Amino acid sequence: MECVISNNAGAYALERAKNKGIQALCISPKSYESRDAFNQAFVEKVMEIHPDLIVLAGFLVAIPAAMIEAFPNRIINIHPSLIPSFCGVGYYGLRVHEAALARGVKVTGATVHFVDSGMDTGPIILQKAVEVKEGDTPKVLQQRVMEEAEWQILPQAIDRIANGRL
């Protein structure tokens, strides 16, 4: 791992990266005059690093088209649902789990997928199901999905890609 970039200066991932001697950067749209200026700065920074793989985890900013074009099938995302359920515009963080509970699903989970020009529409790499339990709140369900699915399948997907098994 060469670099961790977050759009949130308070992200724990930045602190963890620094503690491991990994470059940690915050590039936030709030720091730029326009979305175009942010997109340009973001793409330029990533191009400087020239990563083999870009892993999105909790990055709640749409990826610029120029980056998707520059890194085809080299950007992956973790999403806290079993795509195609509860995904796309407006479905992120607790909102996903609120929607799952409101719908009354019995099973939810997480998906690792390649990033394409759509929102959560890229080819699926891995999925893992998680039981919804009676009395779950969005926060409780979110934590269970992270622990039982996200934290397991994201490293598995990275390993498969890194070792040419995908």
Predicted segment positions?
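One-carbon transfer enzymes
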Residues: 1-166
